[in-house]
UniProtKB/Swiss-Prot annotation:
Its EC number is 5.4.99.-. This is Probable tRNA pseudouridine synthase tag-124. HAMAP family: TruA. Disulfide bonds: none annotated. It comes from Caenorhabditis elegans. One of its GO terms (cellular component) is cytoplasm. The active site is at 85 (nucleophile). Formation of pseudouridine at position 38 and 39 in the anticodon stem and loop of transfer RNAs.
Length: 402
């Protein structure tokens, strides 16, 4: 009988130079959740895509493989809470995966079904788990930071076990009527069919899904006051709910902006929620992606108990402070320029705020505003479902003829 291999403790294993290959069958494993943030404008979205390597998940995958926490991306039972598009940021984003462990005696730690007894590494009873956060941050780009981890059940799914998601969207106050925006925002609270507040393509899964979502809370708050010009004060929209549809927050922002600009009344929200009045979505544009952040993903406390370590947290805060200081310095530089330039000519109310509105609307502001009641309508959900059914039927008939 050969003796079991001895594995050093967690600290020594991190310091030692890892071999290029690792026998994963010799090591126990556990399912963990990680909590992380990323700056969306630096990446091409969260989810892996064939045409780019600069997605957040691709960087995380590479980090997990480089640190020998996983052997194969397709076999680690990966799940993420909320999908974010290119340009959209996240804080307290959550993902779960099965990784290598140092603690075979811990609850939730298990061995592969393929592992033989003689293959198992004999771990010293250090009681210390691998420093997952430190290991991942050591190889991730600085625009992606992990700041907490938690042991979770093998059945845990970061998406389906999430019971509350919170988004934040920041924009300049400009000349917006915040009180009217708040009145409109309150009408979003509750369980509604939000099909007029999202994008619906010909994806079969999206066509067949329910468009009913429950919004718990919506707030429109002025979060900073500019000392020289109130139009540069910052406002934040916060929306919490059970889940959200594709581009739902960005469409909500567009509508609230028009209400704030007093082009529409707050009652427009109720009208768009009434599918008898608006059986399909009026044509209106999508708000800019950069100000949007998936701010929080909530779970039951019995499902997830986050572990945060002071050293890694302090390091993350220091790095984020440097990034914040960089953008603040640039912002102040531009404020000085704007102050000088706007003093050189007389601006109408509309011209003075034009750039602030166009940034959020992500398009030039039209000279003649068209009210929602007079706009062309998008194709209805029912019409798209009928087209999809017809397409499938024709495809089946073609197959039968072959």
């Amino acid at each position: 009988m050969g003796s079991k291999r001895v594995c050093p403790d967690a600290n020594n294993s991190v310091k030692s130079k890892k071999a290029k290959t690792l026998d994963f069958l010799a090591h126990p494993r556990r399912k963990i959740a990680i909590q992380f943030f990323y700056l969306g404008w630096e990446h091409d979205g969260l989810v892996q895509q064939p045409h780019t390597q600069n997605t957040v998940e691709n960087h995380i995958m590479q980090a997990l493989i480089k640190t020998h926490l996983i052997e194969d991306w397709t076999k680690c039972d990966f799940s993420r809470c909320g999908r974010t598009d290119k340009g959209v940021s996240a804080f307290k984003q959550t993902a779960a995966m099965v990784v290598r462990s140092l603690c075979p005696g811990d609850s939730g730690v298990f061995w592969s079904d393929s592992t033989q007894e003689h293959q198992k590494v004999d771990y010293k009873a250090s009681g210390e788990e691998l420093p997952y956060v430190k290991m991942l941050n050591g190889v991730l780009p600085k625009t992606i930071r992990v700041f907490a981890w938690a042991p979770v059940a093998q059945t845990f799914n970061a998406r389906f076990d999430c019971n509350r998601r919170t988004y934040k969207y920041s924009f300049a106050k400009a000349d917006l009527n915040l009180e009217k925006m708040r009145q409109g925002a309150e009408l979003l609270v509750g369980e509604h069919d939000f099909s007029n507040f999202c994008q619906i393509d010909m994806n079969e899964k999206r066509l067949l899904q329910s468009y009913v979502r429950k919004v718990y809370e919506v707030k429109v708050e002025q979060v900073s006051t500019h000392p020289e010009n109130d139009m540069y004060s910052m406002v934040e929209l916060t929306v919490s709910g059970s889940g959200f549809l594709w581009h739902m927050i960005r469409y909500i922002v567009t509508i609230l902006q028009e209400i704030g600009r007093e082009n529409e009344q707050p009652s427009l929200i109720s009208q768009l929620l009434d599918l008898k009045k608006y059986p399909s979505r009026p044509q209106y544009t999508l708000a800019s992606d950069t100000p949007l952040c998936l701010f929080d993903c909530g779970y039951k406390s019995e499902d997830v108990e986050w572990k945060v370590h002071d050293y890694t947290l302090k390091s993350t805060v220091t790095g984020l402070q440097k990034t914040w200081a960089t953008y603040q310095a640039r912002s102040r530089m531009m404020e000085n320029m704007l102050g000088e330039l706007t003093g050189m000519a007389e601006f109408s109310s509309g011209d003075a705020n034009k750039g602030l509105h166009e940034f959020v609307q992500d398009r030039p502001i039209p000279s003649n505003y068209i009210r929602f009641e007079n706009r062309k309508m998008c194709e209805s959900l029912e019409s798209k479902k009928e087209k999809m059914a017809e397409k499938k039927k024709n495809g089946e008939e073609s197959s039968d003829k072959l």
